[in-house]
């Protein structure tokens, strides 16, 4: 991890989990630092992934898990499949990197408010009815946070590779840039 996550106050499990979640979000946000919408949409490898596509995907992912946990999720369309999520990896219409970042920031704020207001991280909600989940299974809010952390971490790694492929910028340099510092070691040493 490129940035330090401060230790939680003794016994503050939810604070620690939220801090690590936000640190992983930061890796994705920083990968977009200084890029135009056009550059962020570039796919510099054989992969279909772009930075703007990853941004939209993680925003939709966090938003949909929060809706599921709060009981406000809309039911999927009849016959919906994983392939229906194709536009979840690209900006369409009037969507921009700035609008997706703002929407993601709002989703992140709602996630934190919901988790902090919960009586316990042991509270559960039902997993969606989807072929990749066991039918009828319930998971805890703790599971939700761990799921979001792993999702963000996976895509922060993708974002690091995509950004370096675009212009050579690496995470340590982007942290320095974000903090208004010059340089930043390519290897963090």
Regions found by a protein language model. Give the residues of each.
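Short, contiguous alpha-helical
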Residues: 2-8, 14-33, 37-87, 127-189
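Active-site rim elements
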Residues: 12-17, 97-101
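Acidic/histidine-rich alpha-helical segments that form the ligand environment
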Residues: 87-127, 139-153
């Amino acid at each position: 991890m490129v940035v330090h996550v401060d230790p939680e106050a003794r016994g503050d499990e939810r604070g620690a989990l939220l801090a690590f979640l936000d640190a992983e979000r930061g890796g994705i946000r920083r990968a977009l630092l200084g890029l135009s919408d056009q550059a962020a949409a570039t796919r510099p490898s054989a992969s279909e992934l772009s930075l703007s596509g990853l941004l939209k995907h993680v925003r939709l992912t966090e938003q949909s898990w929060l809706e599921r946990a709060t009981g406000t999720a809309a039911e999927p369309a009849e016959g919906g499949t994983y392939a229906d999520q194709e536009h979840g990896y690209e900006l369409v219409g009037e969507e921009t990197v700035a609008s997706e970042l703002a929407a993601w920031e709002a989703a992140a704020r709602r996630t934190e408010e919901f988790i902090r207001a919960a009586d316990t991280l042991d509270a559960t909600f039902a997993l969606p009815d989807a072929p990749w989940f066991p039918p009828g299974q319930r998971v805890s809010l703790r599971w939700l946070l761990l799921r979001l952390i792993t999702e963000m971490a996976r895509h922060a790694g993708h974002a690091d590779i995509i950004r370096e492929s675009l212009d050579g910028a690496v995470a340590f340099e982007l942290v320095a840039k974000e903090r208004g510092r010059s340089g930043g070691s390519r290897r963090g040493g």
